[in-house]
Amino acid sequence: EGCKPCECDKSGSRLEQCNLYDGQCDCVDGRGGRDCSQCPEMSWGDPFLGCKSCTCNPDGARSLYCNKVTGQCECPRGVTGLNCDRCDRGTYGALPQCIPCGECFDNWDKLIAQLRDEAAAQLRIGTEIKLSGPPGAFAKEFEELEQVLMDMKSHVNSANVSSDQLENIDQELDNLSSKLKDLKPNLASHGSRTGEASVKISELYSRVLNLQSEFNKSSAKTKELRENALEIQEQDVSGAYASIQESLVKSSALQAKLTDAENSKNISVYFRTSVEHFLQNSNFSDANSENGNENSLDKVVEFMKAVDENVSSINTELCGGTGSPCHEDCGGAMCGKCGGELCGDGAVTKAVEAKNTSRKAEELIKSKYRSTSSTLSELENSNKQCKQATAEAKNNAHEA
């Protein structure tokens, strides 16, 4: 690149000659910079009027050096202020931990920026209309336009954001409304330039209506999301309640069946006791009573058959299998098991199924309750963070 002149400041350098490699001039006390025309390191301002020390916050600034002209310290993202001594708009917390407010604030911030841009655009168009002169045929449209602007201002004021954030928009809307009112006395005297004014008025009217439509869509969408969330929660809980009711009906029916089975069991015990008593009191060793014993034995056999049939019926009712011989899956009396997954007709199996169904329904209710509580807690925390971010943004705006 070749050689470059030193250009050392005569009032701030000791010599006109600079360093041959980096071009740094030899500065006198109280001067700094490459050519000695600025304040020294760690200070800023006009050296002829007096330099000021940099006061960068060590917790918030990237370094202790500041801009030599403005004194602005170099702040990381999320930190602001001349000295980088406070959290920026859209964040909360304490230095150096400035935490972003999150999606809630970001969405509102984008909406506010859009509104600010739209208001500025309407202001420019209104000024152009005033210069070009709108025709008298559009007096009615101007009245409707003023009404739309008033409605827009009402929407903005009712939004859940700080007044400082919307102050510029309100002011611009007021200015635009005032300018439109100033145009009214001149409507009759400006009948020319109809084509140009028609296009501009139509464009202005359309943009303001679109702006109002965006507010309405945003409000409707929020309401729809809240209603949908509530409806889903109610449907889930009602479904779980219906499941419990169904399980209760099944349990009641099975309880009655088990009661009948228990009665049958008591009867079989009575039969067994009677047989044992009968055998103990019978004498089969007497040869003279051979015919009588034979008749008695026949009665015992018939009696035992009846008992066996009764026991098989009880096994089927309780376990789902006859039990004689022992059923491979369902078991039975004296078989070591009773009921199972493949024994759907048994009272024991049905009772277990009903109990499991009730337990699952209970767990479902608890799960939905925990989910609902968690969702409500998140919504409350999000709303709290939005309000906190709005308050901090308002305070930051006042401090700035």
Swiss-Prot record:
SMART domains reported in the protein's UniProt record: EGF_Lam
Query: Glycans attached where?
Result: N160, N175, N216, N266, N283, N310, N356
Which stretches of sequence are listed as region Disordered? 369-400
Query: What keywords sit in the KW lines?
Result: Coiled coil, Disulfide bond, Extracellular matrix, Glycoprotein, Laminin EGF-like domain, Repeat, Secreted
| Major localization listed first in the record, in broad terms | secreted
In which compartments does the protein localize? Answer: Secreted, Extracellular space, Extracellular matrix
Q: Please list the coiled coil stretches.
A: 140-235, 353-400
Q: What does this protein do?
A: Binding to cells via a high affinity receptor, laminin is thought to mediate the attachment, migration and organization of cells into tissues during embryonic development by interacting with other extracellular matrix components.
Q: What name goes with this protein?
A: Laminin subunit B
Instruction: Give the species.
Output: Hirudo medicinalis
